[in-house]
Amino acid sequence: LDPWDHIESAMGLDVMGFEVESKKAYNWLRTYQEKDGSWPSIFYSTEQNKLKETNFSSYIAVGMWHYYTNFNDKDFLYEFWPVLDAAIEFTLTAQTEHGDFFWAKDDKNWLDDSLKTGCSSIYMSLFCYKKIAKEINKQDRVSDIQLKNLKECLRRKSFRFDRNWES
């Protein structure tokens, strides 16, 4: 199980109208969020995994926006804002001068590669984060320049992605 799949499952619960169960999924994420705003890449695995993936952390924004659009529960956005804001702060620390985001961090360092799929997911996550911030009148820590730089990197700097393996 990873945080991204967990959020996808919560969105499936949203579509089916399982509001209480979906909210429990977000409570689970809140419980296991690391102090730096991230989540481990894998839960319930026999292998020790200390990676923290940026697109996994930021994806909670997409899930929260999905929950809100399904249930129109603004209190949910307020309640989980600190979780979301911390996750986005973690992700933003991984943006490079090219606009892409390092895909993961180990115990100490960012891994020097970016994934096109991961950065595409981050783009949507940052977009949803901005919508949530506006909806509940919270400080938005994502600048339009950061989004523009990511979009331009995705469109024009393919050399930035998947550098450590063939995709």
Please identify what each model-predicted range represents.
Residues 1, 40, 95-104, 111-167:
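Catalytic cores of carbohydrate-active enzymes
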Residues 2-96, 119, 123:
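Aromatic-rich carbohydrate-recognition surfaces in CAZymes
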Residues 36, 107-108:
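A general structural signal for short secondary-structure boundary/capping elements
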Residues 47-48, 109-113:
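Surface loop/turn signatures of beta-propeller and other carbohydrate-active proteins
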